[in-house]
Amino acid sequence: MRNKKRQLNYLLVIILLLVISIGYAVLSTNLNIVGSGTINNPTWNIHWENVQVKTGSVSATTPTIDTAKTTVNYSVTFTIPGEYFEFTVDAVNAGTIDGMVSVVSNKLNGTEITTLPNYLEYKVSYEDGIDIAPNHLLAANSSEKYKVHVGYKKDISSTDIPSSPQTLNLSFSVTYVQSDSNAVKPSHPESFETDSWQTIVTAVQNNYTSVYNVGDTKTIDMGTLGTHTLRIANKSTPAECFTTGFSQTACGFVLEFVDIIESKIVSSVATNIGGWSATELRTYLNSTFLDRLPLELKNGIKDTYTVGGYGPAEGETLSITIDKIYLLNYKEVANYTGSIDTSNSYTRQLDFYSSSGVTTSNPEGAGKKYNGTDMWWWLRSAHATKNVMFTGVASSGGISSGYSYTAGGVSPAFRIG
């Protein structure tokens, strides 16, 4: 431990050069017109402008744009793991000719980057996290906001911390040329309903979700389970989500199924001992069910700290699990505070149900359908006073319960990011 503390004092000095190259040669060839005619003074003007440093960044040499407006220079020194520096800068096409990305280059100490040191975070992307790629269009009289992030990783072991001061030269270069038929618009977030899962996941990871609203829906093909609808059930992360032991099931970007996907038992054993953690349904959802999701979506699903209520058997305690897929509890649906569920104080109501006015006295909005017919559906908490039951939601939306070995509706949720 003593060695680790000493190593924390070593510096990372980052010197970064951000370059925008202009494809003049391509343009001069294309505009080499012989004979009579008129060219209405087309202009080619792509450059950097509008540097903005993110709040929370460490002190650094303020990024500056050179007089040609094609290079951004800055340097930063990190002394403690967890420090970072981030800024945005606009790539502006102020001309009358559409441009597109031709070449993207990222170098560390003069060598194209394939891997980074274990202690270093570094990425240049569009502001929403989408990678900058060849053929991306930059239309005339438009701009794209680039984001530069560099940091000293926080969650690293003492062996990953450099044993001496490090000076790292990072350079990013993008070359724009006149656009042609290969030009495509970058896949920025536009609509939860129509965006690809990769675009959605990337947007959530970069906290760029303003175009996605609670209640927005998107259809998903579940193979043999048919086509179903997902909705955004939550976007907020209030202070209570950071409380030790607080379930993360209603914190962050949560998606839930609008309808009931299938009818299944919770467990083939007539007991709720062990709670959610011991159920066959949990195992199924986090294996077979998970594998039915599209790969781009599956890869973006986060591990979720999940708290479930316990039953009346002696020695029972809260069920604590780490899940990809989970069931809700009734607090998350109707802000329930009753005695049937012992985990109420460890979670919160989802944004969707809160904004829809769903409560225990107004539960209709919690009802769900299975193949078009109203049906009750399972929740994850064991019934607090009946040792063979788990909680559920009645077809009317009110709280209910069922024997662990009887079939009920399954309408799970998960988080992405």
Where are the regions that the model predicts?
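Short, polar/proline-rich extracytoplasmic segments that appear immediately after membrane translocation
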Residues: 2-70, 77, 162-183
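Beta-strand-rich interaction surfaces with strong enrichment in secreted/lumenal proteins
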Residues: 74-77, 132-138
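C-terminal, structured domain-capping segment
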Residues: 29, 79-108, 138-183
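Surface-exposed or flexible loop/turn and strand-edge residues in extracellular/cell-surface modules
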Residues: 34, 71, 86, 117-119, ...
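A surface/secretory-pathway sequence property marking extracellular, secreted
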Residues: 40-67, 105-133
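Collagenous Gly-X-Y triple-helix signature in extracellular proteins
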Residues: 183-417
